[in-house]
């Protein structure tokens, strides 16, 4: 439905745009002043259907060329011929901008009605676990939580819905836990914003089946492994296409947003790691962000937004931490970032605290403020907060730190174990 609305809107916009661009005021006056009376020419009737940007541009070119045939002035014909290339570029840009506008409409509507995105992670493997479902539903019905983050592609390389992506037939990695109808049924609990978590460049199954697409260990002569994790080469076109295809299908299940996790290089200085492109700052940042840019365009065309999970320290580190995550670059290519500002993950002494985990409010405030001090729009930052190894009071302090900075927030707990007292009750 979103796609249809986008197409209808683009046709209307295109028509208005052509009338203005093809016949600017000075040209209309010039035509009217011509001594030769232009013959009546019936404008060809063209049915314009826009299933893709490529077809869209073909139709525009066809329409423009037919208008050229109706012009008798050689001066005018040359003028329009020179403009043709510029028109195509401008219309393509307009099409993408309006796809972005439409992708943002539902989000903006939700934010207006609910003020904040307040979410918890729901482990996709547990989607059909009755006890877990009841626990999550209780959180949703009794507290101000209004958002769920649900796995569609996991750290193990499993895809949790029925997919038509080609590589799945080789990988045998479907572990179906939910359908489109079941995702839609979640909204019967309450008005929810739904985010699909998709693990990107960490995939043991893909790395083992397609070793040429993985980060390679030249010492062991096999795909590089780090603590049991296998990383894919971010520059691989095959890997990128695989991920984007999964993301598009996940969007069509009814999710509002796709969230990329492990959108990075391995966090290791292992000298035996080998990549298709030189492992330096420029290549890392370019490979990550060109992929994000491509993904966002595809997802906006489907009506979904794109976010990226990042390490918390990139809010403070002004380089890329050796993993391709540079703050200023990455925020330009996604709709939101979710830095994982878990106090327990900061080293002793961070932000002046010997034990950061004991100071959740202060540590999270300091980390997020570092990003704001670098000029990052607070509306682009939606942190993942710590929902593990913390008391209910600690979790509330995590939330308070984000809320005091007027930021949305998500809570991470790998087992999706949450207690009502960690959140604001609806009656409060």
What residues fall within each predicted segment?
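Aromatic-lined carbohydrate-recognition surfaces of secreted/lumenal glycan-active proteins
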Residues: 121, 193-203, 259-260, 282-324, ...
């Amino acid at each position: 439905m979103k796609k249809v609305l986008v197409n209808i809107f683009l046709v209307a916009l295109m028509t208005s745009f052509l009338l203005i661009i093809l016949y600017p005021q000075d040209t209309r006056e010039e035509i009217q002043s011509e001594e030769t009376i232009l013959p009546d020419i019936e404008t060809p009737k063209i049915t314009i259907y826009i299933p893709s940007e490529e077809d869209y541009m073909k139709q525009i070119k066809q329409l423009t060329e037919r208008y050229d045939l109706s012009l008798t002035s050689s001066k005018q014909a040359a003028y329009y011929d020179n403009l043709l290339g510029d028109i195509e570029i401008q219309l393509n840009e307009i099409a993408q901008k309006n796809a972005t506008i439409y992708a943002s409409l539902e989000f903006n509507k939700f934010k207006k009605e609910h003020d904040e995105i307040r979410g918890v992670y729901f482990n996709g493997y547990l989607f059909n676990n009755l006890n877990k479902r009841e626990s999550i539903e209780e959180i949703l019905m009794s507290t101000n939580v209004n958002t769920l983050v649900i796995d569609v592609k996991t750290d193990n390389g499993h895809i949790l819905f029925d997919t038509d992506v080609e590589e799945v037939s080789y990988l045998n990695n479907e572990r179906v836990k939910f359908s489109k109808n079941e995702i839609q049924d979640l909204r019967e609990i309450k008005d929810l914003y739904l985010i699909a978590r998709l693990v990107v460049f960490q995939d043991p199954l893909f790395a083992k089946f397609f070793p040429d697409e993985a980060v390679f260990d030249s010492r062991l002569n096999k795909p590089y492994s780090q603590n049991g994790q296998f990383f894919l080469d971010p520059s691989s076109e095959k890997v990128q296409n695989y991920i984007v295809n999964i993301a598009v299908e996940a969007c069509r299940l009814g999710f509002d947003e796709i969230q990329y996790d492990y959108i990075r290089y391995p966090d290791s200085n292992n000298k035996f790691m080998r990549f298709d492109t030189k492992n330096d700052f420029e290549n890392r940042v370019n490979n990550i962000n060109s992929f994000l840019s491509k993904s966002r365009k595809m997802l906006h065309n489907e009506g979904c937004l794109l976010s990226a999970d990042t390490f918390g320290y990139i809010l403070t580190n002004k380089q890329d931490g050796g993993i391709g995550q540079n703050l200023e670059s990455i925020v330009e290519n996604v709709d939101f970032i979710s830095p994982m500002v878990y106090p327990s993950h900061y080293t002793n002494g961070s932000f002046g605290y010997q034990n950061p985990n004991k100071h959740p409010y202060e540590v999270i405030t300091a980390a997020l403020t570092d990003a704001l001090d670098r000029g990052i729009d607070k509306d682009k930052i939606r942190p993942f907060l710590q929902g593990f190894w913390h008391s209910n009071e600690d979790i509330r302090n995590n939330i308070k730190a984000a809320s005091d900075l007027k930021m949305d927030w998500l809570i991470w707990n790998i087992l999706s174990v949450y207690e009502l007292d960690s959140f604001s009750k609806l009656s409060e």
